[in-house]
């Protein structure tokens, strides 16, 4: 029996899953203690349910996830509104260092995948199906490069890449919170938290205020930025390079924020925009999690499971020892480490959810919430595509 849910039913199920995750997180100490995001908790439970239904032949669920993209764009547009020139300048060196760490991670993931593939006596191109294509790249890059690998003779590469990306989405989400928690508590990093002043944040005194009458204006500002962003995205596509769909909206939002900030002609309602962005992130993750097809992981052969285990171990070691130490060994570095687990094995929204869960438990981290979406959204996909192209042609 095939059960098809339209976009309204899909987002309704996602909301129920979010509520379930929040309910369990509030009552299960282990989930709260390890900072597991609520959408992941409820989503994994639902994904296991749909997997059992599929395996036993009871039912196969089909979702219309078109609203997932809408929620993703709204969230990243809200992130774009947080960017301004002064903050970007203040994080200049940290931005370069963090970008270097991401580039190194891309290379490590691919070298590990190729090395393990040779040890297991399988094609290095099969190994690449579990490298940075699905890890840093996520499902989008997996879908783009799977057919390319098939053209190079890797049978079922699209399925393998998608399955690996599915695994990474779960592993990165589950790992991020515990990594951040362990670093913070083991090294007593709350003592290193510095409350940033207004001159660094470039926020007015009403940043943390919320006014019901201003939410419509905030929604309108988001919609305008998204509309302008579609034009920017079309212009970027003329370069022949592939960018995430939300990049144009992020750029438009950043421009609107800076024009408003420096001209004083209009106000950007950051408090309300942040709230709307948070809701959009939760809905995006909810839909992404319920549409996971866990049975794809069961179809992986033992060598591929070994490859994925290797990527998981690499991610833990890299974030815990390398990212944390290079980024300063402080609270911000710990939050960044939890974020890298998210977009290093899945997607930037998962990174944001990991960091959000950690910061809700401990303290805010302006630095982490600036660097991760900036590098993860603007640079990682582009650099990853270049690296993947090199590795495919080199092999």
Predicted ranges, named:
Residues 2-16, 62-75, 125-132, 240-252, ...:
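Structural signature of hydrophobic alpha-helical transmembrane segments
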Residues 116-160, 167, 179, 194-195, ...:
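Alpha-helical membrane segments and immediately flanking helix-loop junctions
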Residues 84-114, 165-166, 219-222, 275, ...:
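Entry/N-cap segments of selected transmembrane alpha helices
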Residues 17, 44-51, 64-92, 251-260, ...:
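Hydrophobic transmembrane alpha-helices of secondary-active transporters
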Residues 17-18, 169-262:
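Membrane-embedded hairpin module used as a gating/binding unit in multi-pass transport
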Residues 20-32, 78-90, 179-181, 255-270, ...:
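C-terminal ends of transmembrane helices
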Residues 115-122, 165-202, 313, 318-331, ...:
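Juxtamembrane and boundary regions of transmembrane helices in multi-pass small-molecule transporters
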Residues 24-40, 57, 61, 230-251, ...:
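Flexible hinge motifs at transmembrane-helix junctions and intramembrane kinks/re-entrant loops
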């Amino acid at each position: 029996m095939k059960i098809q849910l339209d976009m309204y039913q899909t987002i309704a199920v996602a909301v129920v899953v979010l509520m379930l995750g929040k309910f369990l997180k509030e009552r299960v100490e282990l989930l709260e203690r390890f900072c597991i995001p609520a959408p992941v908790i409820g989503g994994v439970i639902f994904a296991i349910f749909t997997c059992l239904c599929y395996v036993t032949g009871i039912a196969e669920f089909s979702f219309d996830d078109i609203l997932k993209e809408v929620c993703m764009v709204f969230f990243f547009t809200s992130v774009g509104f947080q960017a301004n020139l002064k903050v970007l300048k203040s994080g200049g060196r940290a931005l370069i260092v963090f970008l270097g760490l991401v580039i190194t991670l891309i290379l490590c993931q691919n070298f590990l995948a190729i090395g393990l593939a040779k040890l297991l006596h399988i094609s290095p191109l099969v190994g690449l199906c579990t490298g940075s294509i699905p890890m840093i790249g996520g499902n989008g890059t997996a879908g783009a490069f799977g057919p390319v690998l098939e053209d190079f003779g890797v049978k079922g590469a699209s399925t393998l890449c998608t399955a690996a990306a599915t695994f990474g989405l779960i592993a990165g989400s589950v790992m991020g919170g515990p990594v951040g928690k362990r670093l913070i508590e083991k090294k007593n990093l709350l003592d290193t938290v510095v409350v940033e002043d207004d001159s660094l944040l470039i926020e007015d005194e009403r940043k943390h205020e919320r006014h019901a009458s201003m939410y419509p204006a905030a929604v309108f500002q988001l919609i305008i930025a998204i509309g302008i962003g579609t034009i920017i995205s079309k212009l970027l596509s003329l370069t022949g390079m592939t960018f995430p769909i939300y990049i144009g909206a992020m750029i438009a939002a950043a421009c609107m924020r800076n024009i408003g900030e420096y001209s004083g002609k209009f106000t950007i309602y950051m408090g309300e925009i942040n709230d709307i962005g948070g809701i959009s992130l939760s809905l995006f993750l909810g839909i992404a999690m319920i549409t996971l097809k866990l049975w794809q992981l069961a179809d992986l052969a033992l060598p591929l499971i070994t490859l994925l285990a290797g990527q998981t171990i690499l991610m833990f070691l890299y974030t815990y020892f390398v990212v944390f130490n290079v980024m300063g060994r402080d609270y911000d570095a710990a939050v960044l480490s939890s974020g890298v687990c998210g977009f290093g094995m899945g997607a930037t929204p998962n990174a944001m959810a990991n960091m959000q869960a950690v910061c809700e438990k401990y303290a805010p981290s302006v630095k982490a919430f600036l660097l991760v979406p900036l590098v993860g959204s603007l640079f990682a996909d582009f650099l990853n595509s270049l690296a993947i192209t090199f590795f495919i042609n080199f092999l």
